[in-house]
Amino acid sequence: ILLSTQSAAWFTENRAEAYLQTEADWYLDYYFLGGGDMLQIIRDYRQITGKAAMLPKWAYGYIQSQERYESEEEILAIADEFQRRDIGVDCLDLDWMSWPDGQWGQKTFDSNRFPDPSGMIETLHKKGIHFMLSIWPNMSSITADYKEFAEKKLLFPGTEIYNAFKEEGRELYWKQVEKKLACHGIDGWWADSSEPITPEWEHTIEPEAGQAYSEYVHDTFAVMPPEKVNAFGMYHAQTIWEGQCDSFPEKRVVNLTRSGWAGSQRYGTIMWSGDIAASWECLKNQVCAGLQYAASGMLYWTLDIGAFFVKKGRQWYWNGEFDKGMEDPAYRELYIRWMEYAAFLPVFRAHGTDVRREPWALGKTGTTFYEAAEVCIKGRLFIFTGSYGVQK
């Protein structure tokens, strides 16, 4: 059953009953998909919500990321090291803070740390490596991008978040991306924080589910149309899709994002499971999460290999179990098991904080964990070649 609500909703199920509560709907459509098998159900779902977009071939390879690479010099050094070790890497992914210091969300490279972004990306391309960049829907109020949105009244009231529900907002956002970022030859986008309001992150202790939901409803309804709040991620993806298809029709869209809605698959989105914490229990849960996501009709799903958080931090979500990081053989084993699982996912990406994520962080050449990582990455070449053919 597919429901058309874009509002915040609460679903509860137990042995005795199941119920759905939505907060604000002008109307509510129910679609019953009664295909003879799961494949037919997925076909029916996509007939209603749109066909999944095809990614470029490189996006099925190995994507190396880190929280965070800090400079053009570091990125090129990482590319050189992969090449020196003869380990294939298809994409390097630059996390937040590409912008000038203090200008969160500004769609401009920091000229001190990235003096020649076009040259950097051209150098990567010559090595056969693509480049992905993190961009955000919010902009600090001191930035030129924010001021342009504010002048045109295309921000949600009282926030630094652009209004993706308005066509004018989507057009202006892409205009800024194209003028100052896409012009350098960027291959893919990491549309981070596409919720984009997350009150649960403000807690030191994990809030109860009901409390987290109530806070989300309260905070989002105060600034967004209540009947659309859950679909912001999809409208944000529409911004990137329509903009790139118009400006660079020869390039397939790649959009790594954290939130979406029914139909996001038609905008070239890859959903990843967010900032998870390192434990065997979490790895087990990721297997279930990936299967459930795929069953929802979405095509591309991935995760942070080894989990985003490795150590124990102050906040409730910074809850990794390996305070010694890569120095702990137990974490290195968990990391490799995660990588072995991820090698069979639609998208294969290493990312996280607390520890380095390049293969050589696992040990010296010839050691067990290093060789295991090398086998996973090189084996992915054969896996994704077949996967690409099937999906094409």
Q: What positions do the PLM features span?
A:
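Catalytic-domain carbohydrate-binding cleft regions of carbohydrate-active enzymes
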Residues: I1-K392
